[in-house]
């Protein structure tokens, strides 16, 4: 039987290769190579368009989630953000689809599970993924026509890029200010301290590679004609790389691409790569940056050392460099982590730490956040390199890295095609063979034999060649309290300068242009030119999966490729005293950071990597899908090769029962500082979710618990803990004692359930025995902690706090407004979900983004928490957004002229995610994770499909129009507006 399977596999591979004969011509494309990559179960086909020289890579794989992308090399000429703004305006209408923003409008005319457009450092690409063949054709046509033949209207440049416009568009006496979607997006980016550090580092290590996203201070120097010229120069087939992945026929796509390309000739493209900073001698640079309000003043410095280490074109040396970076930096047992982070020199690595392949150079960077002595850091790094060279690398560490690489190949992901695209595109656009990068087995095999023959020498040679006694770039950024105000002053100065250059004719033109733009935004367009799917394309039946449930374990037997996935959860309702809720997330994180009385976590971590794909612990809270009552869980998970599944349970037992908080209090302090810094980055990136969670916490018990374990209450706790670290007695009583108490409460055998995904009956039997044994080794008695409370008694925020401000030193704001809705199984839940989607696509996108200039905005209904909410993202005018939110229900009932077609499009948009492909390990896990049965899912699906326009009006009138709402803004205070007592102010800082 095995012999037959091998023969069948070889036969299929040969059949695939016969489809792509080398030298053959397929619709104007010549096949240059067809390379089987058996370790990834795919064949890579390299083609070139004879007429234009455009390159196409096809990944032939038995995967129904098909991907298409078109990419262009787009070296930014300056820091005005022209590649980024072009990415936006390209999708604002084309010759074949002359409607405003066909890309956004296709989001609800499609069943694609992924649609986007992205700007990299020196390339721009437009990918999508779908399982529907007709959808694939529709989106492919829109993407090709939009990128090659966009309208590039000046009006779209003003909307998406930047413009001068009155703050009140219809009032010529109101202030003239800067507006624009990308302008505000990048102001939000600069507010993220990590992003600003990274972008300034990149700009200085690679001065010839400008900021493609755009510097807000430079964006307002860009002219419309610059945009048109940049498109003409770069969005040409000769400069394009197209990509397809999956099971759909390649010939159809090549035929369409050839039709689009044949109007073009071959253009000579400048393939010269910009060069990085020339490090003939060591260079140092210190700049000011954004302060981190969650860390104390003495921990506001980020600093790093960077060496140039060859070029990405040498694939094996680049691979070795990445392995070296892993040995030096990855994990608790790495020499740099122990010497720089565990030692307390920094609380975490800087965001640029690691190995980076950037255009024409590889870099190795070692950096820290929270440095109090930059010179001590630099000296320590040199000492650690010397120590690394003087000692042999433990072969187990190399084996662990190889094990992780090999396991990652077998770990099947639902978005595998997109992941391949992301991995190859940066190098492909700069002349690196994309297929060689897919051949992992060859690289790993060479590493194994090289390390066996030469040992540590292969890594020491790289250090000797590029690091030891070589010049480097020392980059430091010091957090400044005045940073945001200085940026605001610079913007004000630039605005004043532009305003002084205006005469009355200019001012009149600006006013009239604003009116014209608003009129265009309000104009209802004929969208009949856009291709669309219909509700009939959506199945009325949910996908179900056979499960084997016995006692406390449920097993899904499916194609896991020889991997066992284990998830466990423990219900901890009625166990946790209220004062310990904010400590729950810290407790879960501590288990995979500290270690035991006898073994540091670094040693445990290395064993975990050697034998498994990883172990994790977490806290989650879910609402009952019928009653909305909260269920609080301690979660644990891990995965490994089938033959090593027992290691998962051994490691879980070790970290649960033996983690010692007192022995490793210094590591605990490092972890707390790291969490504080991560919290700041999270708020800068996802402030709208923080605002939404805080607002929801006033209305829902589940949301209130979530706030305590991972929201504002948790942020406040972490900030307070950062301020007491130097007081050992206080730290013991306020932190360590509480974590020990949680360990006593949580670690026992009661209320434990498991879910396993395996690929054969024998492995299922093995897992069941391992679960039984694991549970039997845990204490079987409940905690003796007194004063436990019901989760339902967790206090919500006062609902009299209708307006809330969470103060952060950003340049833009994030807003949310929350309302009580209904449970997952309630008959009105589906209509509320459709209402939220229709408001997003048919109203709020126009009002919040196009008119208001925010980067994003919309409405959501969380069926699993029962909360309906509005939000805006990187918003220059949050108070106007709140007014828009408050008027939205009235708009639905009185002004919206929504049609059945509008309703159907919203259903398509919702089912993009409902029916998105899932990985084998996720099959059948919905009930285990959320308590939602297949029967509930089926009823919900039918309710979504059957929702009518009358239902939409009914739920808007019943749940949104009359109900009390809670609004929250994240960002800086607004003078004269966000003041007490009208506003409740939360100031999260040390």
From Swiss-Prot:
Keyword terms of this UniProt record: Hydrolase, Metal-binding, Metalloprotease, Mitochondrion, Protease, Transit peptide, Zinc
Subcellular location per the Swiss-Prot or TrEMBL entry: Mitochondrion intermembrane space; Mitochondrion matrix
A Gene Ontology term for the protein's cellular component: mitochondrial intermembrane space
Matching InterPro entries: Metalloenz_LuxS/M16, Peptidase_M16_C, Peptidase_M16C_assoc, PreP_C
GO MF annotation, one: metalloendopeptidase activity
Pfam families: M16C_assoc, Peptidase_M16_C, PreP_C
GO BP: mitochondrial protein processing; protein processing; proteolysis involved in protein catabolic process
Top-rank lineage group of the source organism: Eukaryota
Cofactor details (free text): Binds 1 zinc ion per subunit.
Residue positions binding Zn(2+): 84, 88, 185
Enzyme Commission code: 3.4.24.-
Active site, per annotation: 87, 160
Gene3D superfamilies noted in UniProt: Metalloenzyme, LuxS/M16 peptidase-like
Cofactor(s) of this protein: Zn(2+)
UniProt similarity note: Belongs to the peptidase M16 family. PreP subfamily.
Quaternary assembly: Monomer and homodimer; homodimerization is induced by binding of the substrate.
Protein's job: Degrades mitochondrial transit peptides after their cleavage in the intermembrane space or in the matrix, and presequence peptides; clearance of these peptides is required to keep the presequence processing machinery running. Preferentially cleaves the N-terminal side of paired basic amino acid residues. Also degrades other unstructured peptides. May function as an ATP-dependent peptidase as opposed to a metalloendopeptidase.
Protein name, entry field: Presequence protease, mitochondrial
